[in-house]
């Protein structure tokens, strides 16, 4: 029997932690997590990492906000179950196929926000917009994130593997 919080279908990635801000009254702390993803549609489970940050922050009652500044990623809450993750990836491919035409990738038409080294990633931007979740806020009670029995916090890479960031802000209500 697996333990309730054991990772099943998602990746746990190596991260570098940077404390960006801590209020003088210890009412809030903000962290940046730096990490590398490996592949398109990779699910990275950050539940334990976020819980550890909350535990070390000494915030008993408040909230945590997790945010990513990347338009080709998503933060979602769901089960860490291989079947679900495979279903999610399959449906995402059906809705936004990799081999479709994306005007974003058409350099003969596009004139805005262009870079020489840019990825061909129109589908990744569309997928990110459909999912529409680059941040989540959750309550913290007794120094624990309030999540359902099977819920996990995922960072989902919708583009190719590369360096990414998550920002975590923990606020105390006391």
Task: For each feature predicted by the language model, list its residue ranges.
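Active-site histidine-anchored catalytic micro-motif
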Residues: 2-174
């Amino acid at each position: 029997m697996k333990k309730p919080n054991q990772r099943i279908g998602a990746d746990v990635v190596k991260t570098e932690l940077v404390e960006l801000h801590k209020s003088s009254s210890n009412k809030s702390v903000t962290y940046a997590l730096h990490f590398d993803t490996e592949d398109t549609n990779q699910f990275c489970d950050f539940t334990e990492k976020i819980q550890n940050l909350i535990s070390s922050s000494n915030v008993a009652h408040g909230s945590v906000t997790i945010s990513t500044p990347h338009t080709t990623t998503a933060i979602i809450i769901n089960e860490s179950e291989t079947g679900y993750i495979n279903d999610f990836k399959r449906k995402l491919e059906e809705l936004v196929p990799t081999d479709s035409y994306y005007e974003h990738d058409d350099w003969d038409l596009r004139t805005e926000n262009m870079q020489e080294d840019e990825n061909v990633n129109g589908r990744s931007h569309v997928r990110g917009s459909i999912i529409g979740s680059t941040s989540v806020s959750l309550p913290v009670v007794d120094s624990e994130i309030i999540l359902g029995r099977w819920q996990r916090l995922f960072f989902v890479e919708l583009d190719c593997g590369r360096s990414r960031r998550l920002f975590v802000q923990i606020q105390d209500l006391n």
